[in-house]
Regions:
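TRNA-recognition modules of translation machinery and tRNA-sensing kinases, especially anticodon-binding
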Residues: 2-327
Length: 327
């Protein structure tokens, strides 16, 4: 067993024995990657959330709070592209039938490769050309072609289950903020720039969850969407990068365990001007994303305005012009 695995096992055992975290529904054999926070775990988690809300809402002169619904109108997720394209690259081992994420297999064996910039076809070709990429279960290099696996949990609202009653558990907390932009701006009378923050649960049907509580199908996000005038976005992007990093350091995280990784142009979404991940040196991997900061321009608000037919423009009284804010 590698030292990183020993370290993680020690953390898991400590959390179980001290009442921080228990396996979910343990008396029935548990549920894979489901965890319940015990008495100390609840206090610990609440302290982190309170510290975040204090720093990002109460102490910030720019931000306000929100608690949006977990189940939203399904058109929300059609508009954002989640229904059609929120997916992981799934493949099967032909030898043992185990299922894996293709990007994870490539990244584990070839960390020097930028998997995030690869298409599904490019991943297929890369795996076929590298026989050192084998199934972690049986050790064979024999995989099916990659296919898309949608990560959203589907459910139904009402007494009948048909296409008209289909809804989804939200896979992220950001969209609840975007669809409420006009409501918040109107009722608070805020002028740009301002942000909206919320803490809430999100759900993703991950193919290969794992590593204790660090990758689960049910999790909480601490989200801030900051709205600003176009042309000032990169300045605010730099501001919030520093703000987020400084808050993490204020919690007692050692600086050498954090790093900021700017996304390469090939990694960026077509609507993004810049993205930076704050990565942490987890005990089970070299580095992993802890926090993502992105300049999303006006993409989200523009999409929702177009699909809903409702104006999400902001009137700037200083310049006497209407525009859709950048985020």
């Amino acid at each position: 067993m590698e030292q990183s695995e020993k370290t993680l096992d020690m953390i898991v055992n400590l959390c179980k024995n001290r009442g921080y975290v228990f396996p979910g529904s343990e008396i029935y054999g548990g549920l894979a990657n489901s965890w319940d926070y015990g008495p100390l775990g609840v206090e610990f988690k609440n302290n982190v959330k309170k510290a975040w809300l204090k720093k990002f809402v109460q102490e910030s002169p720019y931000n306000v709070g929100l608690d949006a619904a977990i189940i939203m109108n399904p058109q929300t997720w059609i508009t954002t592209g989640h229904v059609a394209g929120f997916s992981d690259p799934l493949l099967d081992c032909r030898a043992c039938k185990a299922r894996h994420r293709a990007d994870k297999l490539i990244g584990d064996e070839h960390p020097e490769v930028n998997v995030d910039a690869m298409s599904f076809d490019e991943m297929d070709q890369f795996i076929a050309a590298h026989e050192d990429i084998v199934c972690p279960v049986c050790g064979k290099h024999d995989f099916t072609p990659i296919r898309k696996f949608n990560l959203m949990f589907k459910t139904a609202i009402g007494v009948t289950e048909d296409s008209s009653s289909t809804c989804y558990l939200r896979p992220e907390t950001a969209q609840g903020i975007f669809v409420n932009f006009a409501n918040i701006q109107r009722t608070t009378r805020r002028k740009l720039p301002f942000g909206v923050c919320q803490v809430g649960k999100a759900f993703r049907n991950e193919i290969t969850p794992g590593n204790f509580t660090f990758r689960t199908r049910e999790f909480e996000q601490m989200e801030c969407e900051f709205f600003c005038k176009p042309g000032t976005d990169l300045e605010w992007f730099a501001y919030w990068k520093d703000y987020c990093e400084n808050w993490l350091l204020s919690l007692g995280i050692q600086k050498e365990h954090l790093r900021l990784r700017d996304h390469e142009p090939a990694e960026l979404a077509f609507y993004s001007r810049a993205t930076t991940d704050i990565e942490y040196a987890f005990p089970f991997t070299d580095w992993g994303e802890l926090w993502g900061i992105a300049d999303r321009t006006n993409y989200d608000l523009s999409r929702h305005q177009e699909a809903s037919g409702k104006s999400l423009e902001y009137f700037d009284s200083e310049t006497n012009e209407h525009y859709i804010p950048y985020v």
